[in-house]
Amino acid sequence: MKKTLFAIALMAATIAHSQEPTDTAKKFKPVAIPDDYNKQLDVVYTSGPGFQEKLDLYIPNKTSKLAPAIINIHGGGWVSGSKDQQGGFNPYFKNGFLVCNIEYRMTKEAKAPAAVEDARCALAYLKKNAKDLGIDVNRIVVMGGSAGGHLALMTGLLENDHRFDKNCADVKDMKVAAIIDKWGITDVWAWAYCCKSHSAKNWLGDKQTDEAFAKTVSPMTYLKKSSPPIFICHGDADSTVPIEESYLLHDKLKEIGIKTDLMVVPHAGHSLSGAKDQLKVMDERILVFLKELGVY
C-alpha cells in the first residue's frame, strides 16, 4: 500500500518545491563544548582545483579508551546551509562522542556528485587520523538531515565502493557503524521529477535528464545485506521531502534484514516543523539505537 501511494504522495508535494530549505546570511552562535572537550575549527579535510572544504572537530579529552565519533552533515537542498548553523550536539558530548561537523561543496560550486565526494572524504579524514584523535574506527556514525540525510546515507551505504572517493585520504576500509537519516532524500530521481524539486535538478546539472546517473547518487541503489544499521526519522506531513521516501528505505532494509528503526512524527513538517518538542525524543531514541549497537 505504501508503494502504491508513493507516486501520489510525491505528486502532492509538487506545490512544496518553493519551500525547499534555504538560508540567509547571518551569524550563528558557536557550539558550546564541555570542559573535558577541546575543539579544532575550520580544519581542511579535502581540496582540489578551486575548492577547499573544512570541518570542525569537538574532541573529548583522551583517556585509556577510544571514543566513538559522529559525522554531522547539514542540509539545505545541496544549495545552501553551513556547518556554522548546526548545533544540538550535547546528547553526543554527554556520551563521549567526538563530533565532526562538516562543510561540503554547494551546487553553485560543483554539481553532483561533488557533495557525495566531500562527505566521503570527511569519513576518510576521520579514519586516517583516528589514532591522533583518539577514536575507534569501528564506531564511526554518520548523520544528517534533508540533503545532509541523503549525504549521510550515501557516505555509509557506499561502504568500500570507492567510486566517489576523490581528493580523499587513501583509506581502504570505509565502513561505518551506523547511519542516522533525518528526513533525507533516498531517491534523487523521484524527488527531482515527481516532486519537481528545483534543488535536485540544479544539483544534477547537465545530467538532470539522465536517470541512470541520478540512480548512482541515490541511496536506494546501494542497499545490500552488508549495509550498516540505519535510524530514520521523518514527519508525516513533510511537504518538502515526502515521508514515502523513508517508508521505501525502511521497507527495503527490513526486507534485506538490516537493523533499522523508523520514527514517524505525526503532523510534523520538514525538519519536524510544527513538532519541535519531538527533537529531544528523537535524540533519545537515536542514542538507544546506537547503544543497542554497542557504539557507545
What are these regions (language model features)?
Residues 19-296:
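Alpha/beta-hydrolase superfamily serine-hydrolase fold, recognizing
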Residues 1-24:
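Bacterial Sec-dependent N-terminal signal peptides
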